[in-house]
Structure formats: C-alpha cells, structure tokens
Amino acid sequence: MTENNRLSVKLPGLDLKNPIIPASGCFGFGEEYAKYYDLNKLGSIMVKATTLHPRFGNPTPRVAETASGMLNAIGLQNPGLEVIMTEKLPWLNENFPELPIIANVAGSEEADYVAVCAKIGDAANVKAIELNISCPNVKHGGQAFGTDPEVAAALVKACKAVSKVPLYVKLSPNVTDIVPIAKAVEAAGADGLTMINTLMGVRFDLKTRQPILANITGGLSGPAIKPVALKLIHQVAQVVDIPIIGMGGVANAQDVLEMYMAGASAVAVGTANFADPFVCPKIIDKLPELMDQYRIESLESLIQEVKEGKK
C-alpha cells in the first residue's frame, strides 16, 4: 500500500488524499498560507465563515492568550457571500485545483443560512458545507441554534433541502448534553458532523479591572480543549452513523491519531496554524512514520477498527 493510499479517506462529498484540514477561522481563504507552501498538499480546506451580507466583526481587542490556548471573539468578520463567490473561492480553485473546499456557513436567522447554502455549492470545487450552528438566533432571543435539538434540526432540514453538496454540522460543546443535538441533526439529514467548536471563556486585565476582550467572552481553543474534544467525539461516535471530522486542540500527528481513536474520520487543525504556519504539512509528513510505530496499516482500516470496537 502506498503512503497516499494509507492516508486517504472518503467521506460524503470528500475524497481526501489525507485527513488534514485547516479549520475554519484559522486559515482565512488560504491566501496568507499559500505564501509558505503548496496548499494542494492538504486534504481539504475549511474556509472562513460566509454570511449572506458582509460582517465587520466585533470591536477590538478580539484575541487574548491563555495557558495552552487562546480566546477569540472575531465575530465572523467576512466580506459576504457575493465577494466570496466571485473572488475568494475562484482564487482558491484557480491556484489549487486539487484542493477540495469545505465552505463554512453562518447566519443570524434561518433564512440567511438557507440563502447562502442554496448558492455556495455552485462555486467551483466546493465539495461540502460546514454549517456553523453556534451562531446566536436573533429570532429566538439570541440563543445559539446549536443548543436546542429541535431548533438545530429545523435549521439543518431547511439547509439540506437547498444545498447542492453534502452538509456537515459543526457542534457546539457549550451545551448540557451534546448527544440529543447530534442525533437530531443526523435525523434531519446531516451528512456528517464537525466537532468541537470552541468552549466559552473570559479573561480579565488586572490593571483595568475589565475583561480583556471587548466582547467580554470569547471562544477558547488550542491544546487546552483537546481532552474535552476527545470526550465529546467519543460520546457522539457511539450514537451516530455519519462521519465526524474531529477538531479541538490538534497540534501534531499524535493528536490526529487520538482523534481517530475517539471516532473521527478526518481531522481539522485550528489554533496551531497561528503558532506554526507549517503545522499542517508537518503533520501530514509525520503521520506515516507514526502509523508504522503503532502498526496502523491505513487510516481507513483504523476507522473500521474503531467502528468494530463500538459494537
């Protein structure tokens, strides 16, 4: 078996030569990282969130360092669907035609999500949609879509009805019980899950006596959240039959294999890209050696082994 075959995985809409995917919000649309290496080396790319209209994001400061991670409250800043469809995604496809694109979709109400999902699958090389259901629902008092199984299922069903590509739903860890939400979105037609999104946190400035972030709270990411991600992925993998793209604190090849042990079928790398722009290709290069060390023939065989273990 060649190294390429050992690392390749097939998911709904995604035929990946390797499982490593830069996470949405940590890689922009690839322009900055393309200065460092050929993005065709990646398995896929989860591009920055797309909303129907441009969003300018939250006031600054938007980021704060924490032990083994960071807090961010960017606020889904993006140029909006039209610019992304006419400029950002065509640039990616033209320069990196071998790179499958996963479009991340966000919104403030169901109609916004549906409008974006109906169109973004038309862009060349967009093979799947990642639905960010952690956004506040302005029509339900600001409660995030992803905290209520019925609300989440209704959103997924509406988006699935118009989407031209498979739909992966990004689950929030900021809930009492993630299992009913995972089962609800699967029943509503989700083709896969991505998890986990960031945990909520806050830091204070001792001099000003105020929160460091202008938004007060932010999303906690980085190595600090990996055990939480592994626990929730393992929990959800026991009860769903759709594939999971695991994320949360991944920084090296060992972390990737841990995600597989928990039940993931591919892995997204987020905050680690800020510390080392080359982290994704480094992980890809290291994986075959580590798989040899632990007698793993291929990632597909590991997926099957983990599935057999949960029966």
Swiss-Prot record:
It is an enzyme of class 1 (oxidoreductase). One of its GO terms (biological process) is 'de novo' UMP biosynthetic process. It is found in: Cytoplasm. The active site is at 135 (nucleophile). Pathway: Pyrimidine metabolism; UMP biosynthesis via de novo pathway; orotate from (S)-dihydroorotate (NAD(+) route): step 1/1. Binds 1 FMN per subunit. One of its GO terms (molecular function) is dihydroorotate dehydrogenase (NAD+) activity. One of its GO terms (cellular component) is cytoplasm. Belongs to the dihydroorotate dehydrogenase family. Type 1 subfamily. Catalyzes the conversion of dihydroorotate to orotate with NAD(+) as electron acceptor. Cannot use fumarate as an electron acceptor. This is Dihydroorotate dehydrogenase B (NAD(+)), catalytic subunit. The gene is pyrDB.
